[in-house]
Design a protein with these regions (language model features):
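Bacterial N-terminal signal peptides that target proteins for export
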Residues: 1-11
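Bacterial N-terminal signal peptides
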Residues: 10-18
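Long, charged/polar, soluble alpha-helical segments
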Residues: 25-175
Length: 175
């Protein structure tokens, strides 16, 4: 029931995690990458920065929306600027940062999945105790809700880490 709410987030994070410079090299149709794409890049970076700030400030819905929009813009850049990106190799520092971001994203996603599992278990316990122990029922429900919210935040954070790699890959557009 509630797990299905988080599956698109989890799947989206996996999709973003899988995208890297090597995938960009597989683009078949060369497209021109020009000044309009630099504008898209700057907009995506601004959205990503704002999403991170909103998430830190506790505005989860806004953070999710902005991360999703940034992801859409980076997807456009991948489709249209992929061939040019393939000609540019990442530096050692960028490769190292890419690995760090991938690990952080995977860690956040794993923690989100653990929180979802724990929250589902607490929800099941609460349902069993609803009629016999209403105080314990309410306690489990509050804890489950808090864990679901924390899992949601962590999955968004995972997506932001993954999108930071796209920011790095297309950084040449801002120069």
């Amino acid at each position: 029931m509630i797990r299905s709410q988080f599956m698109p987030i989890v799947l989206g994070a996996f999709l973003v995690l899988g995208l890297s410079g090597s995938v960009l090299a597989q683009q078949k149709t060369p497209a021109k990458c020009g000044p309009d794409h630099a504008i898209l890049y700057k907009r995506a970076v601004k959205l990503l920065d704002n999403a991170e700030k909103k998430l830190t400030a506790g505005y989860t819905a806004e953070a999710k929306s902005q991360a999703k929009e940034a992801n859409s813009l980076f997807t456009i850049l991948q489709k249209e600027c992929g061939p040019q990106q393939a000609d540019r190799a990442l530096t050692d520092k960028e490769l190292q940062q890419e690995a760090i971001n991938q690990k952080l994203a995977a860690d956040e996603l794993a923690q989100a999945e653990r929180l979802i599992k724990s929250a589902e278990e607490k929800t099941q316990k609460a349902v069993k105790l609803e009629t016999t122990q209403p105080e314990v029922y309410l306690k489990y429900q509050r804890e489950a809700k808090a864990e679901f919210e924390q899992a949601h935040k962590r999955s968004i954070k995972s997506e932001i880490y993954a999108l930071r790699n796209q920011q790095m890959v297309f950084g040449w557009l801002s120069k």
